[in-house]
């Protein structure tokens, strides 16, 4: 029944609501002076029994309670990316999310569980090897440039000529590295001064 004002003071049982969500947060007795209404964020309509994992939310327009799923404070995982999402609002579990955490890197969702995504891992290892190769090629070129200058100017020492040849050989061998075999790559040895 809906609340009605009275000419008499009275004490009634009220059900308190959280401002913003109107979820049930407790009950208590409230003193109602004559010609006044209910305290803010409360109702005199009792909530239904609330099962675990739900909260009762009061709809003021309909003057009725609704049960709403409550997963706040929990973490779910996007089945497309594996990214974690911290639930901070009332409502059902978002679509395309699961409670199951991916068990490490390179996981994909198969509809019921996370499984190793060997293709994604392989692609990552290839990209990683390509970056390593590019970086090593740059280092080799940086070593070769001044040695090549000395050779071009015919002022290279025996040691510089030997190093130039070693770095050029290294760069050629490095260029031949097939990154598609990553992570099983045998990188050529970096030349060292003797």
Curated annotation (Swiss-Prot):
Family membership = Belongs to the tfa family.
Tell me the subunit arrangement.
Homodimer.
Q: Name one Pfam family in it.
A: Caudo_TAP
Name one process (GO BP) from the record.
virus tail fiber assembly
Q: What is the recorded name of this protein?
A: Tail fiber assembly protein
Could you tell me the keywords of this UniProt record? Chaperone, Viral release from host cell, Viral tail assembly, Viral tail fiber assembly
Organism of origin is: Escherichia phage lambda
Q: What does this protein do?
A: Chaperone that acts in assembly of the long tail fibers.
Listed InterPro entries:
Phage_T4_Gp38_tail_assem, TFA_Chaperone
């Amino acid at each position: 029944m809906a609340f009605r004002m009275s000419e008499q003071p009275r004490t009634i049982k009220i059900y308190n609501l959280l401002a913003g969500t109107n979820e049930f947060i407790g009950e208590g007795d409230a003193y109602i002076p004559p010609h006044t209404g209910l305290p803010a964020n409360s109702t005199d309509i009792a909530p239904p029994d609330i099962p675990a994992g739900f909260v009762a939310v009061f709809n003021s327009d309909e003057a009725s309670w609704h049960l709403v799923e409550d997963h706040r404070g929990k973490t779910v995982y996007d089945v497309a990316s594996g990214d974690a999402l911290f639930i901070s609002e009332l409502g059902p579990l978002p679509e395309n999310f699961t409670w199951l955490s991916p068990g490490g890197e390179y996981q994909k969702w198969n509809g019921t569980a996370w499984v190793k995504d060997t293709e994604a891992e392989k692609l990552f290892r290839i990209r990683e090897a390509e970056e390593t190769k590019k970086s090593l090629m740059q280092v080799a070129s940086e070593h070769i440039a001044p040695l090549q200058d000395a050779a071009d100017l015919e002022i290279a020492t025996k040691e510089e000529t030997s190093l130039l040849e070693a770095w050029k050989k290294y760069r050629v061998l490095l260029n031949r590295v097939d990154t598609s075999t990553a992570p099983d790559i045998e990188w050529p040895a970096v030349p060292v001064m003797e």
